[in-house]
Amino acid sequence: MEQTEHEERTPAKELLTVEQLKRAWLWSEPVEFGDPILAHTRLDRHAMFYPLGFPVSVMTNSDAVLDAAREGWGWFTCRFDREPIRLKVAVTEDNSRVCPPTPVCRMRDHMVTNIADSENFAVTDLSSQFSTIWATEAAVRHRDYFRYFFLESTAMGCVSSAHATAIHAGCVALDDEGILLCGDSGAGKTTLSYACAHAGWTYVTDDGSYLVHGEADRLVTGNCHQARFRPSAEALFPQLRGREVMRRAGAGKPSIELPIKPGNAIRTSATANVRYMVFLERNVHKEELTPFPRVVGRMYLWQTIRCMPYETSRHLKAIDALLEVKTFELRYNSLEWAVERLKQLVREGR
């Protein structure tokens, strides 16, 4: 969205000199103090969103920021009674139309920084569930970049620190029994999740699952409203053909984002109760489902925890509770075979 006529950006102003202050006093002129660090930028637009069901308050001076948040989170409703995460997003003027570089993320104790350049960055305090984001108009115009690196990363960082344990896994369910599909990048989590959904399973998420703290029976939530595929998935799913291939400022691998809307013949759910964990390996000599060592599963889950030191024990306890389920490795080549083998696992327990 382009800047509207009502969106007036307040430029940084240097402090007044002594002479300017004297002149204003002598002539009884109104004084407008300088604000070189934009500390008084008005954030006069506000909306509440519920990504993955958690409340997030967004305050900003830009309608385009709210549009971006609405695009990513507009489908979600409040599911979890938590104190709202607070994002304050200030947008500044610039003359560029170039997308900023990929941010560099660093964390120490309860502070997280996400810095693209001197004008585009976020600072998050996990202990207070608050983030301040500064972005240029050029960054916000590149909506996919802005959503992914600033809105989603800060909000989900707060969620995964205090409210849930983030797991690099897809999630699908059959007969109300959820399966986490785990594995390295490229193992096929998204394609197998989507193939299961087309075979009548319930789709929860493609590769970002969150094990919710304080909920019974290993409750996982995820973004059931979209899936992000590698371009090579066009050969597997015709509905991906012709869609834009996105690459976020050179970060990561190119992807195709597919919205999954209600009524498009795929059953979705925002949550599932996990009964099985399955680690995926593709391009194998022999297709089979075999037991997977839990100690390796524990290390896989532990290595992605990003939280304050005093929150670590809560995450480790959640992971150990999750690992009480049966854990397997699915070695496969054919999506059809993999879907049928997972169905057998749910129906027969082996």
Regions found by a protein language model. Name each.
Residues 189:
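Conserved lysine of the Walker
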Residues 2-185, 198-204, 209-350:
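A noncatalytic interaction/capping subdomain that flanks phosphate/NTP-handling catalytic cores
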Residues 192-193:
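Post-Walker A alpha-helix
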